[in-house]
From Swiss-Prot:
[4Fe-4S] cluster 1 binds at C28, C63, C97. It is found in: Cytoplasm. This is tRNA-2-methylthio-N(6)-dimethylallyladenosine synthase. It holds the Pfam family Radical_SAM.
Length: 528
């Protein structure tokens, strides 16, 4: 077995050029947000993005939810071993949930890795990289509890128009298939004033959309004793001037209450979109999963949401092949999926995760049976998604243009973005029309539907109806800054986004006033 020392090379003098980095992200939206923090921490420490070139530092932010996450990590590390042998001074860091779980195993399987860090100490990455270079040996640092709330760390957003905002970390649920609570700990809630201050800072930087993140967002407030805190938070965020779109993920059906539905329906900035994880349609399987709701309660939630928000697009998560799942159980899942009419679904084949109660359950379902059921489920959901998308054809929707969503936009002369309900829309740019910038809003008529996206082709080749936004202005200024040319005059008073935002700002008086409405008068000690 080789050692780290065999892979370490002398680093070129810092004066020659800044060291470059690449962050690779696997897993959920929490990981995407974490990677923005890792990127911000690296840039604050003087590293620069490799921008597609071979990087001096490769950081892999891992997921531990499914078995293929392990295979993907070690496959990537095997490839990087050869790259590192010929790339003088290269360093490799592994973080996130799988690193938190496997710890020293990462270094045993891949001794050429320089740094292993966990979910609770992301901010330590630059220090660990420097220590590994100085000492010439791998650095393994895993903490058992949160070192600092991630939103206090520097960040670099992928999308100027949009931002992630963590409202909590960790989870108090005990789902038998899930490893996340063991890796991210018990739920810790941020104070409402801190959350609103971060949203305000994002808006000041040009963002017009935020997504509130938590393992179970609608249990937000458990730490300070307010069961209606999440609904209040939605309303307070919706009052922030300049914030046009609010999304959140993920809620838990057992704790999803009508006050949240009311807040969604009565707050214009909250988008008509809901991600509600089903996991299984079988009550027997839900009980074995320790999902403290049953299928009829789940469908009742969807009915109440659609009563208040008729055009809401509802998405879900479903696991196929949980231990003990029979054909009858699976038929119940198909029944609920047909009744629920999800606009899309994230479907997974059950994967044994050591350390979870489900891993040692009897009656593990054979892989070929799981695969066959998975095929039937995805075929059903694809049909439903197509039918639900076809209902949108002929409607006029507003699309927030993205910089990174459309892979073939250049070949098709289209731009891509998200409708208010979260659906992906590819829209045609007619010859002679102005072209929307990332962050601008475009009003289009949907002309075609596919299972996974909508298309808005120009029927009469008329110019696009573009609403130029502060986010588009911020994107344009950022482009000018990166090219070293003067930025065009801003159309609004909002300043351009810094390349790296250095953590949470201090609160402004107006934000503190808004926060009080969330905290509630019954808990004055928790005011920001």
């Amino acid at each position: 077995m080789s050692t780290l020392a065999e892979h370490v090379r002398d680093t070129p003098p810092a004066a020659e050029r800044p060291r470059t980095y690449e962050v690779r992200t696997y897993g959920c939206q929490m990981n995407v947000h974490d990677s923005e923090r890792l990127t911000g921490s690296l840039e604050a420490a003087g590293y620069v993005s490799a921008e597609g070139a071979e990087a001096d530092i490769v950081v892999i932010n891992t997921c531990a939810v499914r078995e293929n996450a392990d295979n993907k990590l070690y496959g990537n590390l095997g490839h990087l071993a050869g790259v590192k042998r010929r790339h003088e001074g290269m360093q490799i860091a592994v973080g996130g949930c799988l690193a938190q779980k496997d710890r020293a195993t990462v270094l045993e399987k891949a001794p050429w890795v320089d740094v292993v860090f966990g979910t609770h100490n992301m901010g330590a990455l630059p220090t660990l990289l420097e220590r590994a270079r100085h000492n010439g040996e791998a650095q393994l640092e895993i903490l058992e509890s949160l070192e600092t709330f991630p939103s206090t760390l520097p960040t670099k957003r992928d999308e100027i128009a949009s931002g992630w905002v963590s409202i909590s970390v960790g989870c108090n649920n005990t789902c038998t298939f899930c490893i996340v609570p063991a890796l991210r700990g018990k739920e810790k809630d941020r104070r409402p004033g801190d959350i609103l201050a971060e949203i305000q800072a994002l808006v000041d930087d040009g963002a017009v959309e935020v997504t509130l993140l938590g393992q179970n967002v609608n249990s937000y407030g458990v730490e300070f004793g307010d069961r209606q805190a999440f609904g209040k938070l939605l309303r307070a965020a919706g009052a922030i001037e300049g914030l046009e779109r609010i999304r959140f993920t993920s809620p838990h059906p057992a704790a999803f209450t009508d006050d949240v539905i009311d807040a969604m329906a009565e707050t214009p900035a909250v988008m008509p979109q809901l991600h509600m994880p089903l996991q299984s349609g079988s009550d027997r399987v839900l009980k074995a999963m320790r999902r403290s709701y049953r299928s009829e309660r789940f469908l009742g939630i969807l009915d109440r949401v659609r009563t208040r928000i008729p055009d809401a697009a509802i998405t879900t998560d479903i696991i196929v092949g949980f231990p003990g799942e029979t054909e009858e159980d699976f038929q119940e899942t198909l029944r609920v999926v047909e009744a629920a009419r999800f606009s899309s679904a994230f479907t997974f084949q059950y994967s044994i995760r050591p350390g979870t109660p489900a891993a040692t359950m009897e009656e593990q379902v054979p892989a070929d049976v799981v695969k066959e059921r998975y095929g039937r489920l995805t075929a059903l959901q694809e049909r439903i998604s197509h039918e639900e998308n076809q209902r949108v054809v002929g409607r006029t929707v507003e699309v927030l243009v993205s910089a990174h969503e459309g892979r073939k936009d250049g070949d098709t002369r289209r731009v891509t973005g998200r409708a208010q309900d979260g659906r992906l829309v590819h829209l045609d740019v007619p010859a002679g029309s102005g072209e929307p910038r990332p962050g601008d809003a475009v009003e289009v008529e949907i002309t075609r539907a596919a299972p996974f996206h909508l298309i808005a082709d120009s029927v009469d080749q008329a110019p696009l109806r573009i609403r130029r936004t502060r986010a588009g202005d911020a994107w344009e200024r950022a482009q000018a800054d990166s090219c070293g040319v003067p930025a065009p005059a801003a159309g609004t008073s909002a300043g351009g986004p810094p390349r790296v935002s250095l953590g949470l700002p201090s609160l402004r008086a107006s934000t503190i006033a808004s926060a009080g409405a969330v905290d509630g008068s019954a808990h004055p000690r928790h005011r920001a």
